[in-house]
């Protein structure tokens, strides 16, 4: 069976993250959703277009296009760093998204809150934590199946670049035979200092199998069902940056 090359997203191709300090209207809008949820009535209602027009006037958004996205929340791990954008000083607080394509504004509105409040690995983010948060919005595109298992395995599970590609893995559970899946976004591997083998080992564990991972890797043609690579365009904003821009937009 031929490997799948997914239809390229024109929305993904058009995005250029040119906001200040790697920010964008997407990251601001995601942070704004949680801020408004935890502070009902405190801020005027702003649309993504309001934010783009007032804060990022040169940023182009096609609202008719649909895209895949993930929202990530991180929290300062060192309270002594009052203003700090270094990723190493933040710890994961929630990350959820979708590979399904949906309008960008709706996707951010939905998954900014799901990632903050419904990630089962963490308790819901509380209002008091807002000042320590950093929010990232990762727009995904250029999906490509690089390996497909089955009776006639095809492809190369290592046909991807660290720091450039995210990986989505589907594999057969060695004990139950059920299909398991997990993904890591492109920035995770460099942050964790993983090589490609480490990445697959951690994907297998993330999907819920804590048995003999070496057996799975040594026989990946038997266990791996599909490996998909993809790219992401990430923008981030800290609370300090968000709060300053919110004051600017409401002045």
From Swiss-Prot:
Note: Present with 1710 molecules/cell in log phase SD medium.
NCBIfam families linked to this entry: TIGR00296 family protein
Cystine crosslinks: none
Domain AMMECR1: 21-246
Record protein name field: Uncharacterized protein YOR289W
GO cellular component: cytoplasm; nucleus
InterPro entries, per the entry: AMMECR1 (IPR023473), AMMECR1_dom_sf (IPR036071), AMMECR1_domain (IPR002733), AMMECR1_N (IPR027485)
Coiled coil, from the record: none
